[in-house]
Every structure is written in structure tokens, then in C-alpha cells.
Amino acid sequence: QISHVVVSPYGVFVLTLCDLRGKISGHRDDQEWIVKGRGVSDTILNPLWENRKHINALEKKLGSQPFIPAVVFTHAKLINDFGPIAVCVGQLQKFFMGYTRRLIDHDDLELVVDILNEGTDRPLP
């Protein structure tokens, strides 16, 4: 799983990419999910929880920001409804386009980018 941060006027998108193949089942509150594919069944840690851990770390660095979580599945078929933050890669543009209200002004946007680029621990006002 790889995480990416997209800083925009609409919020700070925190994307966790899941490059899994097969059918994924479970529930959004389960600690582990089941991945079935090619005759093999395996368990993975719930990527929604992993995404939340990444947001928690960013909150410590950036302070209170409008974080928008998303877990993006590149190849898997989702068997269950994992909620609106579980997105197949083909739905990603639609996911982004759903955010239309500006929540971060230009100055704070630049500050967020500077903090992430410099690796400083300055909290935002």
C-alpha cells in the first residue's frame, strides 16, 4: 500500500493505493479483509484503517485541515460496500469531481505545500 497526498483548495486528499488482484470482501469495521484470487485466499489489514493512520500522522504535522480520505483499488473487485472512501481507480476522477466547495484559501494552501515539502513540523494557525 502506497499513500499519496493531493493538496487542493477543496481539501487535502489522502490516497492509499491498494494494488491487489482478486475479489475483496469484508466490512469497513473489520480489522482484516479477505482477498480471493487465482484459487488462493489471503487476509490483509483493513486499508481504511491504514488510511486513517496516515491522516492522523498528517494532522500532527499540518494541524486541523479538511482531510479527505480515499482508498484506491487499482485491480481488485470489491464484493462489499466499503463506503464512499473505497474507490476503484476508474471512479477516481468522479470522486475528485465530487468536491466543489473551496475549503483552503491560497495562503494556507501554499503553507500546507511548504510544510510537506520542507518536512517541518510547523503547525498551521
Language-model region placement:
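Active-site-adjacent structural patch at catalytic or cofactor/ligand-binding sites
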Residues: 18
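Surface-exposed interaction regions that form or flank ligand-binding interfaces
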Residues: 1, 8-10, 21-26, 32-125
